[in-house]
Amino acid sequence: MTDKMQSLALAPVGNLDSYIRAANAWPMLSADEERALAEKLHYHGDLEAAKTLILSHLRFVVHIARNYAGYGLPQADLIQEGNIGLMKAVRRFNPEVGVRLVSFAVHWIKAEIHEYVLRNWRIVKVATTKAQRKLFFNLRKTKQRLGWFNQDEVEMVARELGVTSKDVREMESRMAAQDMTFDLSSDDDSDSQPMAPVLYLQDKSSNFADGIEDDNWEEQAANRLTDAMQGLDERSQDIIRARWLDEDNKSTLQELADRYGVSAERVRQLEKNAMKKLRAAIEA
């Protein structure tokens, strides 16, 4: 991987919400656009083509990384590792294979995230701040004496250590969490042993590309629907909301006819025309 390509994957994520908005703002590529760019990269080493392929697929990395949020690892780091996998996939993608890039890249993205989780999950810090470290070491001694705290004991410990009750409860929960190994042997009794984190990882034999594409299409369709609704006149918007979007209190044609002083047939025509415009916008 060239230094320029690598730098794209390793760019600081910064503010996560802003990053995700930026990733989702990049337009998706059609199959023809994707193939043309992939051919430029594959046959001519065109880094601008590589950049466009990467940026248009960042949203998929975000989508995949969300599935690993339960390990207590920073979401930004999971995304960044997934970006490295995306970079590797783009570099190795052969446009002649006949599959979309996302179908090829999803396995590379997940492989990098898996590696990061396996490398870091067990060393997630229980105490990261000075106050937490003080609480951790003192709480360990106190718990040996008192066991699991009731509310009065929580408040007593909080006063003694100069922290909040919330801090005590949070640290107590962290200390109670078992440090599970990643691999359980086949002899382990699944009823008596906690599940190893490896069992929570995604099934490598599964292909999530279709699901990701479907979810993304639904998101894009929702955005197009919102834009299309804004393009309708106020009365047509009201008719669509009342007839289709208000699940708890849908209006009949006659109710809307009475509201606007027109016939039910006229409302039906307005509804039909509005739906036609919305459908065209969603399918565009």
From Swiss-Prot:
Record-linked Pfam families: Sigma70_r2, Sigma70_r4
Any one GO molecular function term: DNA-binding transcription activator activity
This protein's name: RNA polymerase sigma factor RpoH
Record lineage: Bacteria, Pseudomonadati, Pseudomonadota, Gammaproteobacteria, Enterobacterales
Physiological role: Sigma factors are initiation factors that promote the attachment of RNA polymerase to specific initiation sites and are then released. This sigma factor is involved in regulation of expression of heat shock genes. Intracellular concentration of free RpoH protein increases in response to heat shock, which causes association with RNA polymerase (RNAP) and initiation of transcription of heat shock genes, including numerous global transcriptional regulators and genes involved in maintaining membrane functionality and homeostasis.
Motif (Interaction with polymerase core subunit RpoC): 77-80
Substitution effect: residue 80 to N/R: Decrease in activity. Exhibits reduced affinity for core RNAP
Region (Sigma-70 factor domain-2): 53-122
Principal cellular location given in the protein's record: cytoplasm
Domain note: The sigma-70 factor domain-2 mediates sequence-specific interaction with the -10 element in promoter DNA, and plays an important role in melting the double-stranded DNA and the formation of the transcription bubble. The sigma-70 factor domain-2 mediates interaction with the RNA polymerase subunits RpoB and RpoC.
